Amino acid sequence: LRTLTNASRRGGLDIKLPLTIYNTSCYRGIPGRYIAAGPLASRWLQQVFATDATLVQSGAVILGEPAAGYVSHEGYAALARAPYRYQEMLGVIWRENPCRWLKPDESPVLMATLMECDENNQPLAGAYIDRSGLDAETWLTQLFRVVVVPLYHLLCRYGVALIAHGQNITLAMKEGVPQRVLLKDFQGDMRLVKEEFPEMDSLPQEVRDVTSRLSADYLIHDLQTGHFVTVLRFISPLMVRLGVPERRFYQLLAAVLSDYMKKHPQMSERFALFSLFRPQIIRVVLNPVKLTWPDLDGGSRMLPNYLEDLQNPLWLVTQEYES
């Protein structure tokens, strides 16, 4: 909605701008809190992705944010509880366009588009599968490998969680096959584990100072809710039409994760800390909070609420498979 791309110069920097529209949990402004730290965070992540063997092998890419700017409103900044949206109306983030990282035979596809259907109610994912020449299960397995494995590895080894909803994930596609993932948005959509991980030592202090830190049992929901619930949950019903039942969908995901973990036995303690196979997962909700959060008068963004836990589909299909 608010990212502008250079139409005349392919590969030029995108610019992200504030937009006074209430979408999901907040008005989409540019907070000044992360402006100075954003470029430092993206440079650190790019270094990690360029030197970590697993991430290099995955081909995953961090879309850098080389610069950002923000101007505060003197009047609203002086008020203790001024609505936050009035303090986030003048800012900009420059971000690398995915085309900068694509190979000549690749094309960029937002993962959110995999939830879409055409006018005949045919899933777009099905068109990519047909073009790939792969069967649906093989195609899904490849999708999980290039998207979920890098996200989970970043979390377990470095204690860094990215809220990887469908707009933050770009797939590099080649003849309908997902090749690798391009990740973006580190100003507010990146969080750190509360525990001290030595792999995080090189993260600039300026980034640490403005980045939220959560215990492992809450940080894991950035992957479970941020990706499994908000993205995969909407793709899986479409895959049923293509011959992949929902349980089989999650069996394939579980198999990809299990294969990754078997290849990294030295990280077993981290896998236990960030377990994706517990019987239940946190249920994070936004819509009910919208009805009660004093957004018009408050100076802060809405916080999610937690309801009764949900059964974990990865645990369910693993139990069925083992039995």
Model features per residue range: what roles?
Residues 1-146, 173-323:
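Nucleotide/phosphate-binding site architecture used for ATP/NTP-dependent chemistry
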Residues 148-152:
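Short C-lobe core helix of eukaryotic-like protein kinase catalytic domains
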Residues 153-158:
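Protein kinase catalytic-loop region centered on the HRD/HxD motif
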Residues 159-172:
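A short glycine-rich, hydrophobically flanked beta-strand micro-motif that places a catalytic Asp/Glu
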